[in-house]
UniProtKB/Swiss-Prot annotation:
Residues 34-43, 102-121, 203-234, 291-332 are cytoplasmic. Receptor for adenosine. The activity of this receptor is mediated by G proteins which activate adenylyl cyclase. This is Adenosine receptor A2b. InterPro entries: Adeno_A2B_rcpt, Adenosn_rcpt, GPCR_Rhodpsn, GPCR_Rhodpsn_7TM. The gene is ADORA2B. GO terms for molecular function: G protein-coupled adenosine receptor activity; G protein-coupled receptor activity. GO terms for biological process: adenylate cyclase-activating G protein-coupled receptor signaling pathway; vasodilation. The chain crosses the membrane at residues 9-33, 44-67, 79-101, 122-144, 178-202, 235-258, 267-290. Pfam families: 7tm_1. Adenosine binds at E173, N253, S278, H279. It comes from Bos taurus (Bovine). It comes from the Eukaryota.
């Protein structure tokens, strides 16, 4: 496939993912905002995740497309474009980790859960996690970057005359060192939370199964536990999808760092596919919610019917007065 055609396909797929990410995750935020049944601390963390995914669609994907074309710009502008997606990725990981801890507390200490995990505390944790995500994602601005070796777009003489005016080719690997991406970002900030989440969900299932085996458990308590297990399965599925979507791009980064010769000849289609897969993760979560959660499914249908499809039937109320009422038909 010619390079131009390959780039065109990549850009088209990225734009499609951006549209799906924004649409689906705005729907998630709207669902939690309009449904009292969905306004729980757990779902506040999912809204944080959805907000990160909306930002991926609105900003990170356009930035990624821009960077993939290798246009010329000043170093720090390019570095910001490259780092912004790292902020959103880190925020997503922290949101998933917070959800895992939240679900563990719900199963481990059900009687104290409501007093421990309140809406105010959840919002405070979310704010702290976003601040931490920005700190981690923007670390290259503190000096861990490739400014000194970045390939520039100007003539060598021009760069030597006025370094501040030197434009560089805006490519991710031209501004962010692989040592940062592998040692700090992947080994330090991505892999540990994923492993912690794996341990937490294993513990959730073990604790819940032990409690379900207790013969003296009341029917109501058994129903609550079964519901918690179902929720944990859904959230574990989201974590699994996140890992599957993001591990390929991190694997390529590791190969680029540890096998420098391969880094010079790695196929562009492999890089683009890995990047597309990582961005596809932002479009998948709303589908999981709709498939696995009855309340989300109901609220999605309600919002789409009322505000998008405008399904209303006319009601005559009194003389000459016309009213409208939304109609919902849910097959749940």
């Amino acid at each position: 496939m010619p390079l131009e055609a390959q780039d065109a396909v990549y850009v088209a797929l990225e734009l499609a993912l951006a549209a799906l990410s924004v649409t689906g995750n705005v729907l998630v935020c709207a669902a939690v905002g309009t449904s009292s049944a969905l306004q729980t601390p757990t779902n506040y963390f999912l809204v944080s995740l959805a907000a990160a995914d909306v930002a991926v669609g609105l900003f990170a994907i356009p930035f990624a497309v821009t960077i993939s074309l290798g246009f010329c710009t000043d170093f720090h502008s390019c570095l910001f474009l490259a780092c912004f997606v790292l902020v959103l990725t880190q925020s997503s990981i922290f949101s998933l980790l917070a959800v895992a801890v939240d679900r563990y507390l719900a199963v481990r200490v059900p009687l104290r859960y409501k007093s421990l995990v309140t809406g105010a505390r959840a919002r405070g944790v979310i704010a702290a996690l976003w601040v931490l995500a920005f700190g981690i994602g923007l670390t290259p601005f503190l000096g861990w970057n490739d400014r000194k070796i970045a390939t520039n777009c100007t003539e060598p003489g021009d760069a030597a005359t006025n370094v501040s005016c030197c434009l560089i080719r805006c490519l991710f690997e031209n501004v962010v060192p692989m040592s940062y991406m592998v040692y700090f970002n992947f080994f330090g900030c991505v892999l540990p939370p994923l492993l912690i989440m794996l341990v937490i969900y294993v513990k959730i299932f073990l604790v819940a199964c032990r409690q379900l085996q207790r013969t003296e458990l009341m029917d109501h308590s058994r129903t609550v536990l079964q519901r918690e297990i179902h929720a944990a399965k859904s959230l574990a599925l989201i974590v699994g999808i996140f890992a599957l979507c993001w591990l390929p791009v991190h694997t390529i980064n590791c190969a680029s760092l540890f096998q420098p010769t391969w880094a010079k000849v790695k196929p562009k289609w492999a890089i683009n596919t890995a990047i597309l897969l990582s961005h596809a993760n932002s479009a998948v979560n709303p589908i999981v919610y709709a498939y696995r959660n009855r309340d989300f499914r109901y609220t999605f249908h309600k919002i789409i019917s009322r505000y998008i499809l405008c399904r209303t039937h006319i009601l005559k109320s009194g003389e000459g007065q016309v009213g409208s009422q939304p109609t919902l038909q849910l097959g749940l």
